Amino acid sequence: MSRRVEFDLSTEDHSDRRRTNTFSSSADEDGVPNEVADYLVYFSRMVDEQNVPEILTLYDQAFPDLTERFFRDRMWPDENVVERIIGPGNKLFIILYKELYYRQLYARNTRGPLLVHRYESFMNYQELFSELLSSKDPIPLSLPNVWLWDIIDEFVYQFQAFCLYKANPGKRNADEVEDLINIEENQNAWNIYPVLNILYSLLSKSQIVEQLKALKEKRNPDSVADEFGQSDLYFKLGYFALIGLLRTHVLLGDYHQALKTVQYVDIDPKGIYNTVPTCLVTLHYFVGFSHLMMRNYGEATKMFVNCLLYIQRTKSVQNQQPSKKNFQYDVIGKTWDQLFHLLAICLAIQPQRIDESIASQLSERCGERMMHMANGNIDEFRNAFATGCPKFLSPTTVVYEGVNQSKEPLLRQTQSFLEGIESQMALPVLRGYLKLYTTLPTKKLASFMDVDDEHYDSFIGKLLTYKMIVNELGKEAGPSSADDDEPQTDIDFYVDRDMINIADTKVARHVGEHFIRHIQKLQEVQDVLKRLDIQKP
């Protein structure tokens, strides 16, 4: 349990204290403990004062602590009770409180909340984003990075949950069928179009794409941003909305658009996403998965390994903060195992050097499975994919009665994945033979692999397929990590008429070149700083 947080109300004037006592009496009548009432009053005041460090403590520590102590078996008070406690004129705080309320409702119902609660939660999100997007001037609101990310992440999650819910008749009772029919006819809740519209509107309002592009081109982002783009709140919401869109496009099976969405996001240790652990994991997981589905196995491997290394480094933090583990780190624990199975797929098709600590854990977890995959066992590929992939969705599928169809998108994506794998089943064996030679006649290699004359042309096609994988075609489709010029595979080759020429590309690391590259980067940064027009104080 996290440490208890005391709420200092001593700075209130006499009228504030008198008002608080009045609301505390009201809270007693509503069955709300005085400590919770004090928390809500103080929380509202901190949001109004834009005290971000204190808001972070109240959100990240106090809320889970009070939930554990007072609301393990019941819900937090509804908005009417909260409004009586904190007083009128706090519309934005009530909306933010309801976002927390419905998020807790989703978290504690294993079968999912009732349809009415799903609908009300969407209406609350719509009201929140309407407040932010329809204002003529930037809203004077400051929230911690983790809360801003959680708002976007939960919004996408609830959309995903609703799509799975309406495709599964077993998740609702008879009374909800008529309400679902009405919602679908009017398309006024959790429809794909308003969801995408909200996310893209956040991108447009914040000019986040233009700003990230300017940063990538070493230009001043303020030159392409208006007052909304220069607002810390809108910039961060737009940034997190990019990653929310990445996730949404992957769930819909549009991997090219997913990577295009984050093409200007620099995946480096100083990215904004790095301030929120679950955001970092989400970004790496979905970028890596997109590369996997587009058969860019080298890029996918980089994403998965970097993410696993990050989780490995932060495990001690998770263990020391059990209250956070239930809320912030839940997604990290679930993704940890998924990443290993996806990494196993990549390395079975395209072996390469990875961090030794990750390689050791991968061998323990998936060593036998990888051996079967390398030998062409298609069922092992299917099982690894099913374990590692996200829960795909079909936004237009509605089943009012009959068989559950929520897994149909998964079956389609699995079939698409396996079709690509089946065309590459011979590649691990092919690589094994190529490693033994520096030159090798194509006819001789074909005989090694029991390829007769009738299938010789298709065999040459497999050679070209493997060459494409080695060259990582399509790498430019998304963000990549540093040191891309260092070879990741241990062989390369080319075909000259009927002869295969093979080169061993496993080279020692050149430490000097590493420092030279970073010195050049430092010089580039210094040049950019010199060009910036910064007025001296």
Curated annotation (Swiss-Prot):
Q: Which UniProt keywords apply?
A: Cytoplasm, Initiation factor, Protein biosynthesis
Region feature Disordered, mapped onto this chain: 1-30
Q: Name one GO cellular component term.
A: eukaryotic translation initiation factor 3 complex
Q: Name one GO molecular function term.
A: translation initiation factor activity
Q: Which domain of life is it from?
A: Eukaryota
Q: Tell me where it resides.
A: Cytoplasm
Record keyword Cytoplasm present: yes
One of its GO biological process terms is: translational initiation
Please give the Pfam families that the UniProt record associates with this protein.
Paf67
Q: Which family does it belong to?
A: Belongs to the eIF-3 subunit L family.
The annotated subunit structure for this chain is: Component of the eukaryotic translation initiation factor 3 (eIF-3) complex.
Its biological purpose: Component of the eukaryotic translation initiation factor 3 (eIF-3) complex, which is involved in protein synthesis of a specialized repertoire of mRNAs and, together with other initiation factors, stimulates binding of mRNA and methionyl-tRNAi to the 40S ribosome. The eIF-3 complex specifically targets and initiates translation of a subset of mRNAs involved in cell proliferation.
Query: Under which name does UniProt file this protein?
Result: Eukaryotic translation initiation factor 3 subunit L
Q: Which organism is it from?
A: Caenorhabditis elegans
Traced from the root, the source organism's taxonomic lineage reads: Eukaryota, Metazoa, Ecdysozoa, Nematoda, Chromadorea
